[in-house]
């Protein structure tokens, strides 16, 4: 008798723990989704700017990703500096807004398109600039907060 009631108690505790975890996950998903909506709309609006190059260089995607890297650097440094920041706010800003705003898939697509067109040098320049400027932007964002 004692053994079976102990197991039943553990099962109840386990179910409660799972329900609490699921609730936290759903709330986190809502924060990421709301931020993603904002970031995606901002990304779309930036894409409407009349910025073009004669050679088809994807300058708008580069600008978008560098801005996003700079902002995520600010957020990461602010979260590290101020541990009182709400983790859900950090999730909303980093995974949500920055994740929705920046785009690796577009970067990869544009690089592949340039290579298909025989613009290997331009594609290589784009990859190098994206990596270097992205890392520098994160670093500058972090320095701004420190």
Predicted features by range, described:
Residues 2-146:
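Membrane-interface helix-loop junctions in multi-pass transporters/channels
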């Amino acid at each position: 008798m004692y053994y079976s009631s102990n197991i039943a108690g553990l099962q109840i505790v386990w179910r409660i723990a799972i329900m609490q975890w699921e609730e936290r996950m759903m709330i986190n998903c809502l924060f990421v989704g709301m931020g993603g909506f904002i970031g995606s709309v901002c990304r779309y609006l930036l894409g409407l700017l009349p910025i073009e190059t004669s050679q088809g260089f994807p300058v708008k995607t580069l600008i978008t990703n560098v801005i996003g890297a700079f902002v995520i650097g600010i957020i990461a440094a602010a979260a590290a500096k101020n541990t009182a920041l709400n983790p859900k706010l950090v999730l909303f800003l980093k995974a949500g807004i920055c994740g929705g705003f920046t785009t690796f898939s577009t970067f990869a697509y544009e690089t592949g398109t340039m290579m298909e067109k025989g613009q290997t040098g331009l594609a290589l320049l784009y990859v190098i600039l994206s990596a270097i400027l992205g890392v520098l932007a994160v670093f500058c964002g972090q320095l701004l907060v420190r």
